[in-house]
Design a protein with these regions (language model features):
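Extracellular glycan-recognition regions
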Residues: 1-152
Length: 152
């Protein structure tokens, strides 16, 4: 993610998801803002959450003790294709990521609240980044197709 302003979007085909699968798009810099499509009991939902690390000390070394999740929004999803977008604003005193979704790639809906992208070189990462992900929580075999990634 590059300032003072940037925007990235992905189009994901969800037809191959199995129950328990998770896929999505995130902005992270130690703490994260995450758009996740979850499939459970044959139904898909889009979840917007903030994930943040709780640090501790292990013999003088800073370590992550746990990662906490704050869910900000959850909506049912009937489509087998979704567009996810994250806008970054890195002006003086801003450092925000704002999250959007679309079912057609044209009309965008904001979801959740902006997430502060905390820049702290002593923690995890130098600079905010985008991430596209897909994983199983129950059984292997599901998949998604990332049809596009656009960055401005």
């Amino acid at each position: 993610m590059v300032g003072p302003f940037c925007s990235a979007s992905v189009c994901i085909d969800l037809k191959g998801m199995k129950n328990g699968d998770r896929t999505g798009f995130a902005a992270y810099n130690g703490d994260s803002g995450v758009l996740t499509v979850e499939k459970n009991k044959g139904k898909k939902e889009l979840v917007m959450s903030e994930q943040y690390s709780v640090f501790g000390d292990n013999q003088g070394v800073k370590v992550i003790k746990e990662v906490k999740t704050k869910e900000m929004a959850r909506i049912p999803l009937k489509s087998n294709r979704i567009y996810l977008r994250i806008d970054g604003e890195f002006g003086l005193g801003k450092d925000w990521a704002t999250f959007f979704y679309s079912l057609d790639g044209k009309q965008w809906n904001r979801i959740g609240e902006p997430v502060k992208m905390v820049f702290d070189y002593r923690r995890m990462f130098m600079g905010s980044k985008y991430a596209v992900f897909n994983y199983a929580t129950k059984k292997l075999g599901g998949y998604v197709d990332v049809e596009s990634f656009e960055y401005k």
